[in-house]
């Protein structure tokens, strides 16, 4: 589902998967200006509705310029905020996901481990129903 979400972000922003938009990737040290979609904590699964779950994700925007990092974080926020009953793009032969997304506004985390890139975080929850 995270790959499909990245495709949705790519379709609705200027970011490109694998270039400056990454899913669950920590091998992005060489890329200064990028968005990383991470899954930092477990989500919720309904015992009765087995095809539905809530997945907490975070979009990290990183840049050598603090204002660029903030602008990039808000670009993802604007693409995702208020999504309701949207089908994510199918990647490969995967299932169809119908989702609702609730976002928090991006906030400044500080500098990354290299001490030269500003990082903004935007937490969001994806409420997903597997349609196939």
Label the model's feature ranges.
Residues 65-89:
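Mid-chain, well-packed structural core segment of small domains
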Residues 51-67, 76, 117-128:
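Oligomerization/assembly interface segments of phage tail-like spikes and tubes
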Residues 22-23, 62, 79:
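Predominantly extracellular/luminal cell-surface or secreted proteins
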Residues 2, 128-132:
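Short hydrophobic/aromatic patches at helix-to-coil boundaries
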Residues 81-129:
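Acidic-leaning, charged glycine-interspersed low-complexity segments
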Residues 1-49, 83-95:
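Small/polar-rich, solvent-exposed N-terminal microdomains that initiate assembly or binding
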């Amino acid at each position: 589902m995270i790959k499909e979400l990245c495709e949705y972000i790519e379709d609705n922003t200027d970011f490109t998967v694998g270039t400056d938009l990454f899913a669950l990737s920590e091998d992005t040290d060489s890329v200064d200006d990028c968005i990383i979609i991470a899954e930092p904590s477990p989500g919720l699964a309904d015992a009765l509705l087995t095809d539905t779950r809530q997945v907490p994700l975070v979009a990290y925007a990183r840049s050598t310029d603090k204002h660029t990092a903030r602008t990039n974080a808000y670009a993802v926020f604007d693409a995702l905020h208020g999504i309701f009953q949207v089908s994510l793009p199918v990647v490969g032969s995967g299932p169809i996901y119908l989702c609702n997304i609730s976002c928090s506004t991006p906030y400044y985390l500080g500098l990354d481990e290299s001490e030269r890139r500003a990082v903004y975080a935007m937490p969001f929850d994806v409420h997903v129903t597997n349609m196939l």
